[in-house]
Amino acid sequence: MRGTTSNGAAPSGAGVAVVIAVKRLADAKTRLAPIFAPHDRETVVLAMLVDTVAAAAAVAAVTVVTPDPAAAEAARALGAQVLDDPTPAGHPDPLNNALRAAEAAVRATVPNVVALQGDLPALQAQELSEAIAAARTRPRSFVGDRHGTGTSALFAFGVPLDPRFGPDSAERHRRSGAVELTGSWPGLRYDIDTPDDLLAARRLGVGTQTARAVGAER
């Protein structure tokens, strides 16, 4: 299995902040319910976040925006900054609102922002480093997920992030002017929504915390 951090990724995150939005663990990844009991699902979601933050933190400063105390504690333990999610209950677009709040918080000191999904357990720091380097050549860009419909990462260099995560987000980001990056970064594209996604990521190789949480051999 691959580890949570890279095999010596060259730092490329100067002037870049990574922001990750995480909902309450009890409400996250409900499509994994067929294979995990509620408490076990929360454990897996938290493990995926830890592996994602660990990989990202090897490249750039990370801010996690969340209302969940356990997610906040885990992020702080990895050296990430934590922002209490200001999104009110019942907000029609909670994920993008949380990302905009995190963007506003980091823009005071960092000109460039990457919005990263928090469920990328196979992510390698080298992949994120290479994607950031590619993104520097244009103001706004994104990396699609392995299905081609979602977005794993959105990059904004000197311009507003304008996140449009949600159903068909790849097309929504494309229509908003973001350029799709086509590099070979499999771990950056394997976000987890369904049991099939998790199986595919495990075949690719997940980080140590996710491997432990799902009972995979390490």
UniProtKB/Swiss-Prot annotation:
It catalyses: phosphoenolpyruvate + GTP + H(+) = enolpyruvoyl-2-diphospho-5'-guanosine + diphosphate. GO terms for molecular function: GTP binding; phospholactate guanylyltransferase activity. This is Phosphoenolpyruvate guanylyltransferase. It is an enzyme of class 2 (transferase). Its EC number is 2.7.7.105. Phosphoenolpyruvate binds at T151, G166, S169. The keyword GTP-binding applies. The keyword Nucleotidyltransferase applies. Belongs to the CofC family. InterPro entries: CofC, Nucleotide-diphossugar_trans. The gene is fbiD. SUPFAM superfamilies: Nucleotide-diphospho-sugar transferases (SSF53448). Pfam families: CofC. Pathway: Cofactor biosynthesis; coenzyme F420 biosynthesis. Guanylyltransferase that catalyzes the activation of phosphoenolpyruvate (PEP) as enolpyruvoyl-2-diphospho-5'-guanosine, via the condensation of PEP with GTP. It is involved in the biosynthesis of coenzyme F420, a hydride carrier cofactor. NCBIfam families: F420_cofC. GO terms for biological process: F420-0 metabolic process. It comes from Mycobacterium sp. (strain KMS). Keywords: GTP-binding, Nucleotide-binding, Nucleotidyltransferase, Transferase.
